[in-house]
A protein has these predicted regions:
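Non-catalytic alpha/beta scaffold blocks inside enzyme catalytic domains
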Residues: 174-176, 191-204, 208-376
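A generic structural signal for solvent-exposed, polar alpha-helical segments
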Residues: 134, 141-143, 315, 322, ...
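Acidic, Ser/Thr-rich low-complexity intrinsically disordered segments
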Residues: 376-393
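N-terminal export/assembly segments and adjacent metallocofactor-ligating motifs
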Residues: 1-249, 256-264, 268, 346
Length: 396
């Protein structure tokens, strides 16, 4: 018998007794990643797959060898023995890890995301996804969820009703200027479209930006990964979430104490940059809309519980201008609301009547108002996405 349960790397285990020596995994490391961690060793009926010369299978795309193994000899350490695959409910969607917009299947069990698998799209990610994207759902969808709005009273956050929370947000943001508004790059085009309308209603001169973090990439990472971690950075800016100063400039101004109020959606600013803690503590009014009680949310005057990427439907626009669909794979907990629903309720409180019944209706409004999206139809985007009709342009 060949070896069993051999650790090849941080994400992959090898069961040699299942292996048929097809060498797909070896060729993947030679031809795709060009990192050459795997090799066939020995001869005849003693031949086996092995790590080459003491290497570890730890390249940024390593878990793809699990997907291409035809017999289950290579297994995913994160998913191994978690759930029988035939119990999984599979939903086509888009990876929220970066602005490449890799096509994925979100596979869930008992209303929890169990794993991401790559979905073929030759125009975007071919057959692959990176390990960072494959496992990012643990951070984005894990942890204890917020399920009730909270409002600050006598120095602490206490539960409140949605009606009271939304009224407090409207009153606070309407009366406390200047305003900084930061939207997560994981919010959909439809949510960004509504958020831009909302902030411009509250304060036309507000500093409005989509959160963005960039990183340096190795040559192997560049095969599929984007320097920009925000999957819908381009789309959000197309929707008007931009006051043209850039996110870094806005955060510098926030740290310098140049704002009296802030509305932060879906990002933990303190977790990303500790220097912002003191500045956020000094704000006269801070609203945080998020899925969990983050370090930033702990400082808020009002906290609104929202849905995460796997619980929503809509579209992302990747860095190359391809509009692609997200689909809801799981149901949000009772008490949490869709970001788009929250924005529409605040717009209604501000006297702007918006009553879109679905993301497709919001997208139809986008196609009317945003130049680059004219001619696009939500129903015809399909599972492979659609290219923008022109080079991009903000909401008119």
């Amino acid at each position: 018998h060949d070896r069993k349960k051999t650790i090849f790397g941080p994400n992959v285990i090898f069961d040699g007794e299942r292996c048929i020596k097809c060498t797909r995994c070896v060729r993947f490391c030679q031809e795709i990643t060009k990192t050459n961690e795997l090799a066939v060793v020995n001869r005849g009926d003693h031949s086996t797959i092995s790590l080459f010369d003491g290497a570890m299978l730890d390249n940024p795309l390593s878990a793809n060898v699990v997907d291409i193994c035809p017999v289950g000899a290579l297994t995913d350490r994160d998913f191994r023995f978690k759930v029988r695959v035939w119990y999984l409910e599979k939903t086509p969607s888009i990876c929220p890890g970066c602005s490449t917009g890799c096509n994925i299947s979100v596979e869930a069990y008992q209303n929890k995301i169990a794993r991401f698998k790559p979905r073929v799209n030759e125009a975007v990610n071919s057959h692959w996804i990176c390990d960072e994207g494959r496992y990012c759902f643990h951070d984005l969808a894990g942890g204890e969820r917020l399920t009730t709005p909270m409002i600050r009273q006598e120095g602490g956050l206490v539960p409140t009703t949605w009606e009271q929370a939304l009224q407090a947000v409207y009153s606070g943001l309407s009366s406390t200027k200047p305003l900084a508004a930061i939207l997560s790059g994981r919010n959909t085009n439809e949510e960004a479209f509504l958020f831009a309308k909302l902030i411009k209603n509250f304060a036309p001169e507000a500093a409005l930006e989509v959160f963005c973090q960039e990183r340096e990439l190795s040559e192997t990472q560049k095969i599929i990964m984007s320097p920009d971690r925000s999957p819908n950075f381009r789309g959000a800016r197309d929707m008007g979430v931009s006051s043209n100063g850039g996110c870094a400039t806005l955060l510098d101004e926030l740290a310098a104490g140049n704002f009296s109020s802030a509305f932060v959606v879906g990002e933990d600013l303190v977790g990303s940059d500790e220097r912002l803690r003191a500045a956020l503590q000094k704000l006269s009014f801070l609203v945080v809309q998020d899925t969990r009680m983050s370090e930033t949310a702990k400082l808020a005057h009002v906290v609104l519980p929202a849905a995460h990427f796997g619980e929503k439907e809509g579209t992302y626009t990747n860095r190359k201008g391809r509009v692609q669909k997200l689909n809801a794979a799981v149901i949000p907990p009772d008490g949490a609301r869709q970001d788009s629903e929250i924005f529409m309720q605040l717009l209604e409180a501000a006297g702007e009547a918006v009553a879109y019944a679905s993301p497709s209706e919001i997208f139809a409004a986008i196609a009317r108002e945003v130049t680059a999206y004219q001619g696009l139809d939500y129903g015809s985007i399909g599972e492979q996405g659609a290219e923008l009709t022109s080079g991009g342009g903000g909401a008119s």
